[in-house]
Amino acid sequence: MSYQVHITSTAEHDIMRAADYIEFTLKNPNAADNLLDAATEQIGSLADLPQKFHLVDDPVLASWGIRFVIINNYLSFYTIDEEKQTVIIVRFLYQKSNWTAILRQGFSLI
């Protein structure tokens, strides 16, 4: 059964901010395009089997059902709403950021 994939406005902003940083600060538009392509592909693949990726190691975040997929040097965090058959992408953060603290501050599901 296929799931719908919903990207929150915060996660969309995260993705665009990452691509802008790579393109304009690092001056590497090809890498920015590659990141966007990889994000589109990996996030889209969650529609088929969202359970294939693990829960995060943090016990609090895991209790919230937060999973992640690695996309280049970034982590895309998501939850699964089994009742609605929906995957919700909540954040897209740099792998070396303090993502545990960022996620523990809370996030929007819209």
Task: Explain the meaning of each model-derived region.
Residues 49-83:
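Basic/aromatic recognition patch in beta-strand/loop cores that engages polyanionic ligands
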Residues 1-38:
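Arg/Lys-rich, positively charged N-terminal/basic patches that mediate binding to nucleic acids
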Residues 27, 44, 48-52, 74, ...:
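Generic structural signal for secondary-structure transition and capping sites
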Residues 71-110:
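Enriched for short, Lys/Arg-rich terminal
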Residues 4-6, 34-44, 63, 68-70:
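PIN-domain endoribonuclease scaffold, especially VapC-family toxins
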Residues 8-10, 49, 90-92:
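Generic beta-structure capping elements
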